[in-house]
UniProtKB/Swiss-Prot annotation:
Name this polypeptide is given: tRNA N6-adenosine threonylcarbamoyltransferase
Cofactor requirement: Fe(2+)
EC number(s) from the headed UniProt entry: 2.3.1.234
Principal subcellular localisation of the protein: cytoplasm
PANTHER family in the record: TRNA N6-ADENOSINE THREONYLCARBAMOYLTRANSFERASE, TRNA N6-ADENOSINE THREONYLCARBAMOYLTRANSFERASE, MITOCHONDRIAL
Amino acid sequence: MKDRYILAFETSCDETSVAVLKNDDELLSNVIASQIESHKRFGGVVPEVASRHHVEVITACIEEALAEAGITEEDVTAVAVTYGPGLVGALLVGLSAAKTFAWAHGLPLIPVNHMAGHLMAAQSVEPLEFPLLALLVSGGHTELVYVSEAGDYKIVGETRDDAVGEAYDKVGRVMGLTYPAGREIDELAHQGQDIYDFPRAMIKEDNLEFSFSGLKSAFINLYHNAEQKGESLSTEDLCASFQAAVMDILMAKTKKALEKYPVKTLVVAGGVAANKGLRERLAAEITDVKVIIPPLRLCGDNAGMIAYASVSEWNKENFAGWDLNAKPSLAFDTME
């Protein structure tokens, strides 16, 4: 049987990435051009800057991904691309490149939801058994997703306000930490003690919804009040207390979801899945189901995860037309 090579594109935010997946599970290349340095001075991603960077490097990323995979353009079987959610300008760059490549070579175009990509990155660890539950935690999303089979996703819980990664970055900005702040807060948290009493919103409520805005506001108020009074606060203890509150919320809701949806596998994915504190809590507290977390290199935004997610769409022959457009607010319930 002839090998299948999927060329995948990911440009939903501030990483330009192109990958090649051989058959169902052999990731031959996963080229990522990061823009973090360009956005650091702004304390967050500037959409116009992100789009410009994508345009500048995407051709080189395609060439590098093919070369690293050891294949030529003629070997590619299909093209997969993120079409949402994300920044509309950034998404359009990847869509334009993917559609151009697919059209020029007469290849099918596979539309992929960015968050489905995060979830299916777990396929790189081992074949997934369905049904399963997924906790997706990133800079833009915090969701609990029930997956009855590959490609069939249902959101069963989500944040009412800030995403968990967004809360990390906003708290980090207040403390003067470098963007993105998640990794540094995690490192500092492991050096401090949980001594500040921060709220755990809705932690005892019988639902699967998250809320981090109250926690974020409480942190900012404590920090600014101390500054106004000339008081000194331990950065390490602040980070430890903030992270403890975040993890308490995530763990409480995940446990409730596992009670409501009896599955054998929990996937934890997204940029925040790289958090050491979260991984420690999962290992200590979720012991009655298999927990699968993608490797660190596949936790952040990357085209490898888009390639993995595209396999189920390929199997269903869920191909897009040339009119496929960016959907910045795309949800699982509105996938093509």
